[in-house]
Amino acid sequence: MTRPGFRKGRPGGGRAQAAETDGYLSSSLFSQAQILHLMKNEFARARRHGIPLGVVLLQVDRLPQLVDIHGSSLRSTVKQAVAGVVRDKTRGSDLLGTTNDDRYLLVLPHTDAQQTRVVAERIHQVFSSMEVRVEERALELSVSVGITACDDRATLFFDSLLSQAESALRYAMGAGGDQVVSFAETTLLAGSDGGLPLSEDDFALPDDELESPDPEERRGG
């Protein structure tokens, strides 16, 4: 099953060299306020027209510890790597932004649960063979990925979709990281309560960001 407008990755063999990713990629990420605003709009559209909406929440494993070891410049390098990989494996209409705690939120319009899994696995697979350069040293990265999708009108609230993605990500990280976990899988493992407890502050916004932001104003790297 192919999503409309899928953009194939750039050709090339060998191990990906994330440090060579163009610097402008990290500046193309939406801020947290912007991506949440855009996701809310897409959720409303999906509910209104009965079309699917996929959500991917991604976090680089052990990033705080790696930054402590290799320096703060690694965070910018990782941001470029994530932006580059997602750009290659998604469509131009898909939306990527940063959230709290160095996480990345990817919103996939017109994408059902099965297609969301395919996109997430493609992104995860790239990271399994990726190196970034840090002070002339090659550093391997891995990512934990939580996914969910709104395939019909059963999901009533925008916040529920965020909580589902967060729950799935927590399971992926709690199981050792370096894997993709769907919210549906967490409900099978933990029963109907949806899995691990969630923090109400995970997606809390400062008061000055609660007003609708201008999505055209991208945050710099």
Name each region found by the language model.
Residues 114, 118, 150-167, 171-211, ...:
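Catalytic cores and conserved motifs of cyclic dinucleotide signaling enzymes
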